[in-house]
């Protein structure tokens, strides 16, 4: 990696370590990665194990209204493919891939290039980081290495959020079952 890439990594890691919440860390990550890599989109999908879905939790470049609302089953789309394989998926024409899944809410149909990297912690997928470009291109090995390094840092942040019970991002009041309450004894 070049000195510039190392400086960028250091800056991102320092800001993430100084953040006060998982959501803030994810937003820092997508904004800095999009800027550093000069990509049109950077998104992070976190795995909701209970529902077997990847939920879009942060994005720079996709429709902001889709964040926190769009999800894919673990067997769906290119994000699901990255998670199933537990390895990088690098495509120069993503919409032509058999696993591409069009999600109109995100506006991602205009992006051709796709690089998805699994966020792994102790050999377990916790999410997927994705960068996309309108222009068709294969992302370089340096770009892959940059994202793998950032995903290693991100996995620790997510694992910490799990450990301290700060990852209840998947439980919204509408998703919780109705509990019956009883008055009295």
What are these regions (language model features)?
Residues 31, 43-67:
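GAF sensory/regulatory domain recognition
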Residues 1-24, 35, 126, 160-185:
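Signal-transmission linkers at sensory-effector interfaces
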Residues 55, 64-99:
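Regulatory sensory and allosteric helical modules in signal-transduction proteins
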Residues 112-120:
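A short, aliphatic-rich beta-strand micro-motif
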């Amino acid at each position: 990696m070049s000195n510039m890439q190392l400086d960028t990594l250091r800056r991102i890691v320092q800001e993430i370590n100084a953040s006060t919440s998982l959501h803030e860390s994810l937003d820092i990550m997508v904004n800095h990665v999009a800027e550093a890599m000069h990509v049109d989109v950077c998104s992070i999908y976190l795995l909701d194990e209970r529902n077997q879905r990847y939920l879009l939790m942060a994005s720079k470049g996709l429709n902001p209204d889709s964040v926190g609302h769009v999800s894919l089953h673990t067997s769906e789309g290119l994000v699901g493919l990255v998670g199933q394989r537990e390895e990088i998926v690098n495509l120069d024409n993503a919409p032509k891939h058999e696993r591409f899944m069009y999600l109109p809410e995100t506006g991602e149909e205009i992006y051709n290039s796709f690089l998805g990297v699994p966020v792994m912690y102790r050999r377990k997928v916790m999410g997927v980081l994705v960068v996309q470009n309108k222009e068709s291109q294969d992302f370089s090995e340096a770009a892959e290495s940059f994202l793998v390094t950032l995903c290693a840092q991100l996995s620790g942040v997510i694992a910490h959020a799990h450990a301290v019970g700060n990852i209840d991002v998947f439980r919204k009041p509408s998703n919780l079952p109705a509990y019956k309450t009883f008055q009295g004894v």
